[in-house]
Amino acid sequence: SMDDSIGAVQATLRRLKLDDNTIIIFFSDNGGHGAVTSNAPLRGSKGMLYEGGIREPLVVKWPGVTKAGSTCREPVIGVDFYPTLMEAAGVQRRKGHQLDGVSLVPLLKDAGASLERSALHWHFPAYLQGYTQRHGAFRTTPAAAIRMGDWKLIEFFEDGELELYNLKNDLGEKNNLAAKQPEKVKELHAAMLKWRKETKAPVPSEKNPDYDPKAVLKPRGRN
């Protein structure tokens, strides 16, 4: 049905003679649901800060700009779409207008280009119910993640644990290198704290008294 729906959209654009002047963007806001499918070789699923929860496909068709069949390896994030579409539409940013993302137009024109961005950030200071290997009752507990180059750091706010992964060598995030790479942990954590301060991102000020990492989610019965 997804293929049919995308085809219907493109057919309508062709019928209205708008297909040569329309940008089509296809993406997901999160990874696949673990109970329905497998995200292998990625770890985790929808609602988690592991790659299985935040890495998803992105396909862009921009007639006359993007090269059909080209592949770009530059990591991007959802907040990049707003500045991208502003630039594509020729909309000038207001003076002093601060945006979280960056325009992807350079990448759409040249898939081999790179963005001048030091890090990508994810911030989730809340609980999401559901079983995981790390927690029996929560798919996600309050946490944040940062990616700088091939390195990724995850901070769990409840217990302060830090997990470090090299995504180039360990895309499945099986080997936590935090103990072996303390200087890299320090570097990424400092960048994370700096971003958090600049954006005034909310962080839990105290632990949830009802939080129990050993708790197990009990399935609800049907009425």
Predicted regions and their residues:
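Extracytoplasmic/secreted proteins, especially bacterial periplasmic and envelope-associated proteins
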Residues: 1-8, 37, 80, 84, ...
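Histidine-centered active-site microenvironments of extracellular/periplasmic hydrolases
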Residues: 11-65, 77, 137, 222-223
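Surface-exposed patches in mature extracellular/periplasmic domains of secreted proteins
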Residues: 20-21, 93-96, 202-206
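Long, internal low-complexity/basic segments
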Residues: 81, 127, 148, 158-161, ...
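Loop/turn elements at helix/coil->beta-strand transitions in domains of secreted/extracellular proteins
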Residues: 18-24, 115-117, 149-151, 184
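C-terminal cap/loop subdomain of S1 sulfatases and analogous C-terminal strand-loop tails that border
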Residues: 31-38, 44-49, 66-70, 74, ...
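A generic secondary-structure signal for well-formed alpha-helical elements
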Residues: 10-13, 17, 31, 63, ...
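Beta-strand elements within well-structured catalytic alpha/beta cores of enzymes
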Residues: 6, 13, 23-28, 58-59, ...
